[in-house]
Design a protein with these regions (language model features):
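DNA replication initiation on ssDNA origins
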Residues: 1-80
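Catalytic micro-motifs at enzyme active sites that drive phosphoryl/nucleotidyl and oxygen chemistry
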Residues: 69-74, 98-114, 159-160
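Short, surface-exposed ligand-recognition loops at beta-strand->loop->(often short) alpha-helix junctions
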Residues: 85-94
Length: 160
């Protein structure tokens, strides 16, 4: 079942992928040239220029499925996946924390961010009874609360 929505320009659906397909695409050479270009721009021109170039990469909606544009009205289903960003890390810090993050039982996916100075950690969360919130307000409240707890957990775990 393909349930993660992939967007171009952050709003337009271009594909749906499984978790395995996403991990494979990130690990393969599919986006390597574009990511290397972003890292080069970051090193040569700075963060602002790199952020502009980064917008050209497809975006993955880990938290929800959408039909059409990425808007509240087009949200089909909340998936409960939360993305934790840890940014502004040195190469040494990245090398130190990646094994820690990979070893955490909550981590589903982890990858180095496009600029090469941070990590993106994908974790799945749900209520104790394995259900997920359904209304937009329940989703917003749940997502915020769980994100806050998980960001704190990973910060403590990685000692950052």
């Amino acid at each position: 079942m393909k349930h993660f929505t992939i967007f171009q320009n952050f709003y337009y659906v271009i594909a749906e992928m499984t978790e395995e397909e996403i991990v494979s695409a990130i690990a393969s050479s599919t986006y390597r040239k574009r990511v290397e270009e972003i890292r080069h721009i970051f090193a040569e021109q700075g963060e602002k220029a790199a952020n502009e170039k980064k917008k050209e990469l497809p975006a993955i909606a880990f938290s929800a499925c959408y039909r059409g544009r990425r808007t509240k009205e087009n949200l089909v289903k909340y998936l409960g996946h939360i993305v934790i960003d840890i940014d502004h890390l040195s190469e040494e810090e990245l090398a130190r924390i990646l094994p820690i993050i990979r070893g955490c039982r909550y981590t589903r996916i982890v990858f180095i961010s496009p600029k090469g100075m941070g990590v993106k950690i994908v974790v799945r969360a749900c209520h104790p009874d394995e259900t997920l919130p359904e209304t937009l307000q329940e989703i917003a409240n749940f997502h915020h609360a769980v994100y806050t707890k998980l960001a704190s957990l990973y910060a403590q775990l990685c000692q950052i």
